[in-house]
């Protein structure tokens, strides 16, 4: 029986993971569930899956969770220490940690899991973006197992030879092709993007996701973060990662080999598929997802990304080229910018403007510890907030 901690169980990834686990309760036992503030859903999840521990990062939500579970006579223990996430991620009775917390908040507990040699199913791409070198080093030193949940990176893993490590050199890979839907504004003009509203940006054509990642998909920053993530996961330079727009989201990524072969993973756009493969890797288990109907699909289209219209993708490549703390700055500025856009404090196009400003303003420096990473993250956020104060649409 594999014991699992889900960091971020009330989000899209967490909910989908629990759906897959529910199909295989003979194989997987939920050891702990954590969330930020969605106490009602977390209460329901605890009632159904009966984890040994639960924790809500929001203090008021955590107190309410205690009351809710007490009223249900639940045996689940609600933790209240500020280090509870790290403690759960490194707990000796935990085999597997699903890292599904959105943003920089997931960095420390995911690092704790890596340092403890856990099997890490990684959905929190920010860990690799912010602290890729440190995280990969921790995984190797502790002999932890790292399996991506992101559909694109999971697809790459599926078409790599099983016997090889996640390394492009040893697999005869020429390049990786990361597919992107193009988001809701793929056919919009640059002029039209000036007037985009949060409501419009949250209408993703293919995927049902959380707000932050949906906005990232609309700006194509999500794909930029995935390029950075792929560099660390597969030890491949950015020059050998190509982004291809594929509106149908049926092909989740492709790998081109040196012999001229190109292998792709296809499937309906449903996160339960990569989650199921991550859980059972290298074997396969039922996910609850229907098979792909190629006749109904009819066609698969591809096009190059427009970097002029979607500059966030280019900024991610720029961060990789600069190296050092640049990806950390990129990520922090983007998180602040997305939140500001959702509050209608800045425009859609100002998201990229803010990120570029921060990347130019913060001095390059090496990252030798998680503390240094967090310092850069904090400094960038303060700078970004100051920029917003000067450009705030609501002020």
Task: Tell where the protein language model's regions lie, with residue ranges.
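Catalytic, metal-anchored helix/loop core of enzyme active sites in primary metabolism
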Residues: 1-395
